[in-house]
A protein has these predicted regions:
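Glycine/tryptophan-enriched, flexible segments
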Residues: 2-159
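Active-site-proximal binding-pocket segments
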Residues: 92-241
């Protein structure tokens, strides 16, 4: 029933509020008269750069607006296979546009206009996922703590808390480091650590393993994803967990 309601809502959104025109980049930008005070980067408490903890990121990702459009060019040729291939982690049939979207290197409107004439089931499935991304942003506006706390009544006693025992903490660390002994879980978690990304189906599998097999509080998983994903978006990450 939930899935049916979501699909009906996605259809209504497109009918009532079609995406605006894709705006071209401005020819010039005027320099403001006054600049706001800037932050000191060290005050952001970012992860340390020595030792270099993210060399795999630079090998795996091309960053910037040009890279985002290059990836979109590739995706425009592949999106037709998305509906059938999106649940197969062994195949490269996902857009991997999420980091570019998260960091503002490309707009969902730009993606929509580029792909809207693709008359395939794959495009319609992907289109709903773009809407889901905006839906998560809307939810976080209504429930600002959604990324950390559920918006329905919740009993903490359901979950094992790593702060209450060494064994539980060890199980959490084994999950984080890809040492559970379950190949698909370990492969996904190691990929996450090396590249900052994981196939969406494997995200579901690893999250389900933490919650339903290890019975560890989901918020520990949500925080780990938030710390390690290059597309770690507060709204989408919280909504999906």
């Amino acid at each position: 029933a939930y899935l049916e309601e979501w699909q009906a809502m996605a259809k209504a959104v497109l009918e009532l509020f079609p995406p605006r025109d894709d705006l071209p980049a401005p020819d010039t930008l005027h320099t403001p008269k006054d600049w706001p005070d800037s932050d000191v980067l060290d005050d952001w408490s970012l992860l340390p750069t020595k030792p270099d903890w993210a060399p795999g990121f630079r090998k795996f990702w091309n960053v910037g607006e040009d890279a985002a459009h290059d990836r979109l060019d590739w995706w425009a040729d592949e999106v037709g296979e998305y509906d059938e291939g999106r649940n197969l982690p062994s195949q490269d049939i996902t857009s991997q546009m999420s980091p570019h979207l998260h960091w503002g290197e490309i707009s969902p409107v730009t993606i929509w206009h580029r792909l809207k004439d693709k008359r395939s089931k794959g495009w319609k499935t992907y289109e709903k996922e773009l809407i889901w991304r905006d839906y998560a942003q809307n939810v976080i506006m209504q429930f600002p703590d959604y990324g950390d706390e559920p918006y329905r009544n919740f009993d903490d006693s359901l979950w094992r808390n790593p702060n209450r025992g060494h064994l539980i903490q060890e199980e959490l660390e084994a999950w984080q480091q890809g040492r559970t002994g379950y190949p698909i879980v370990d492969a996904g978690m190691r990929q996450l650590w090396q590249t900052g990304w994981m196939h969406n189906r494997v995200r579901m599998i690893t999250a389900s393993f933490l919650i339903k097999h290890l019975l560890i509080d989901w918020r520990h998983g949500e925080r780990w994803f938030w710390d390690t994903l290059v597309d770690g978006d507060y709204a989408s990450n919280g909504a999906n967990w």
